[in-house]
């Protein structure tokens, strides 16, 4: 992000809350978003977060989450400049420890207990079933740009998944169905001195809660249905919906969850490649990840 633009956004936010300009320290910066801790002359601190599309809906999601009683950082002010969103919010401080599986279970149970938010995008059964077709569309656009030309295996895998999607997607609206955080990882559960808070709602939507549960352990390792089953059982024991353990689409719940989560991730990676990032230099990094995830999808969804 252009430094002058981020400075202008921060100036706008400070004006809204009646504070002088603070000192800034980066916490983490990505290509389309960033997080900073800002310290005001009186010693008080806040978190300054900025993002552009498709991460520019987070303020809306945070407000909806707060209205429903979810533990999220308090939002003090928001501003828009040149299609960039700026937010000033509570500084929760340094976590006292990393979140573990039980923290993730507790967060998921609370998230899934609140009523769905009508202002969030919807990903129901039809939306899930459309993901492989959307990914094929992304592949076609990439090929028209003379990129991803040696990816016939990706096309074949997506075709198989698309053909089976109508059957495998069955059960998508079984409980838990509602809030989906979509970036649900241990780093999104902040465990502080005053309890835990959920962070990073930029891509929240309404859909199958199993997508979140399947995302918690990340995507860098080979997906483990056994580990996923244990996590689902912990979730139900902690008060989560019993149907989280129910078979869906002719598959065990854990295979369904992991398979559709990986398919959701594949479509997102390919959309980034052609639309949001759109940098051919990054294709050598994206293609192997997509191949690996598609191999997992084919195996997990048994297509």
Residue locations for each model-derived region?
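An alpha-helical support segment within catalytic cores of ATP-dependent transferases
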Residues: 4-17, 118-182, 246-247, 293-303
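Conserved N-terminal boundary motif of the eukaryotic protein kinase catalytic domain
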Residues: 17-26
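Active-site acidic catalytic loop and adjacent metal/ATP-binding pocket
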Residues: 28-40, 166-211
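A generic structural signal for beta-strand entry/edge sites
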Residues: 33, 83-86, 190, 195, ...
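A glycine-centered beta->alpha junction motif in the catalytic cores
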Residues: 81-99, 141-145, 263-283
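Glycine-rich, phosphate-binding/catalytic loops in enzymes
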Residues: 105-106, 197, 214-216
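Active-site activation/catalytic loop segments of kinase-like enzymes and analogous catalytic loops
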Residues: 210-243, 259-282, 293-295
